[in-house]
Amino acid sequence: MNMMMQKLSILFLHLILLVLLCVHPLTTVADRNSTDWCDKTPYPDPCKCYFKNHNGFQQPTQLSEFRVMLVEAAMDRAISARAELTNSGKNCTDSKKQAVLADCIDLYGDTIMQLNRTLHGVSPKAGAAKSCTDFDAQTWLSTALTNTETCRRGSSDLNVTDFITPIVSNTKISHLISNCLAVNGALLTAGNKGNTTANQKGFPTWLSRKDKRLLRAVRANLVVAKDGSGHFNTVQAAIDVAGRRKVTSGRFVIYVKRGIYQENINVRLNNDDIMLVGDGMRSTIITGGRSVQGGYTTYNSATAGIEGLHFIAKGITFRNTAGPAKGQAVALRSSSDLSIFYKCSIEGYQDTLMVHSQRQFYRECYIYGTVDFIFGNAAAVFQNCLILPRRPLKGQANVITAQGRADPFQNTGISIHNSRILPAPDLKPVVGTVKTYMGRPWMKFSRTVVLQTYLDNVVSPVGWSPWIEGSVFGLDTLFYAEYKNTGPASSTRWRVSWKGFHVLGRASDASAFTVGKFIAGTAWLPRTGIPFTSGL
């Protein structure tokens, strides 16, 4: 099925849902009730169950009202799940269970925030305009669903699924959020096509005119220096001070002087508009060594975890030194909406870069790794980047991406544009003995595209790999595509023959995965001063 056919199929699904929900006149409450609406969602049973057991809802008369009800239902279930998780932790003494619980409590807290953000954005007070577009809402709902999956995966990392699964499964939260995605997706397809929250000039309201100047001449609010010449000698100390701001409007710049900072940093939720500026990727290095084998979840193994909105990093290396034998070990995890990484190096082995959720842009970055070293479920674009597979363990293959799209209505995926895929120095001597693939399907609807990128002979002729050798998981439902790549490995003659793999022939098909369309970059990147190409 070519790209156009798949786009038409997705459009058809949206339109069928829209027609089923909206075609009949809705003049009175008696014409339709919540059960009828629920029947038209992907998961009607948890929808019906919730509304049956919760009185006080006004019957919806249009699709947008039903969306609000679904988001309210999902948020109610998320609040209940988080409370139960918190309760379960009171008497928990097992270190692995404690680690998973800590992640899940945070993740469900963020899910509540994303659902609340959506609710307030799409259902403004009487007379007020919507404060977000349906595109924004789809991003936040996608994040809410990703959070629940990350919680579940964390319990699998540390083999405590029997402890976590009963708590989070009983709420049916994932199915309720999937229903929200389907209905909001129908509204988005119907014509409410915004890109992101913006003012009348097309720029987001959170960006100030100072941002562009900040990249040219840094005027730091705080300075971090190993030699004691700054305000602090650790990066986290400066981040914590920024997090205590009473007013968070405007960019808060932290200048991190050259040096190796051995610490794990976290920019928490609500610590927004942080900008970390280093002295260059070879000079300012933040490094840690956490790993799953060391008792951490993949999510919490990150040397740097970024959650606050609108984060920018420039000229910094994020490194995980756990090594190839320690399994999953993240150098950088971003869950920050509208985040930017410019001229940064992200270095590790397995699971180097977790593009966890939300909209992200990487420009002129270096990414090193072995197995699934760019993974997660953000809408992430890598432009003018250098992707460097390293030498893996004996018998291992390299896999560049493992994209985690779990629902066909999530507006997520990985786009690699105008970049280069080359062997890292340690792989060069043995490059002919190690297979390297551009991606494999971590989840059923995995989506990765490689556009106008130079593929050195490090890339296997087949291009892509199943999740496990011989497995057919996701091969019909994933979306992997290539468009006008160059280099020794760019020929698609020997590529996989899966139903979900596409060689794009038209610019109009490929442009759906560019900065301008995939992450709505023209609405929020210009005033940062970060260079970018909007289209192909």
From Swiss-Prot:
Quick one: which pathway? Glycan metabolism; pectin degradation; 2-dehydro-3-deoxy-D-gluconate from pectin: step 1/5
Expression sites by tissue: Expressed in siliques.
Mind listing the GO molecular function terms for this protein? enzyme inhibitor activity; pectinesterase activity
Disulfide bridges in this chain: 365-385
Which residues are listed under the site Transition state stabilizer? 350
Q: Where is this region: Pectinesterase inhibitor 59?
A: 31-183
Glycosylation site positions: 33, 91, 116, 159, 195
Subcellular localization is given as:
Secreted, Cell wall
Q: What does this protein do?
A: Acts in the modification of cell walls via demethylesterification of cell wall pectin.
State the family it belongs to. In the N-terminal section; belongs to the PMEI family. In the C-terminal section; belongs to the pectinesterase family.
Name of the protein in its database record = Probable pectinesterase/pectinesterase inhibitor 59
**The encoding gene:** PME59
